[in-house]
Amino acid sequence: MRTLILLAAILLAALQAQAELFSVNVDEVLDQQQPGSDQDLVIHLTGEESSALQVPDTKGICACRRRFCPNSERFSGYCRVNGARYVRCCSRR
């Protein structure tokens, strides 16, 4: 029983350290973004059918999540942290 408690404590400490490291890396990625990179981008394509591609507004608080966005946030693309791909989630307005 003591061994199980000790292993659980070590696992929790490792998970907490990993979460803190991930939080710092996300802050570094957000700080590296260029000023004005959160502006809207519209691309008009010519052809028989009229079409346009609009990149959603990503202003607000964003975070890189491992799998999916919670209900309080919306999907806003992908981000890379140390070569790993994460889902970018931004707060809803």
Curated annotation (Swiss-Prot):
Sorted keywords for this record are: Antibiotic, Antimicrobial, Defensin, Disulfide bond, Secreted, Signal
User: Does Manganese appear among the keywords?
Assistant: no
Enumerate the propeptide ranges: 20-59
**GO CC list:** extracellular matrix; extracellular space
Give the superkingdom in one word.
Eukaryota
Functional summary from the UniProt entry: Microbicidal activity and inhibits corticotropin (ACTH) stimulated corticosterone production.
**Protein name (database record):** Corticostatin 1
**Whose protein is this, by species?**
Oryctolagus cuniculus
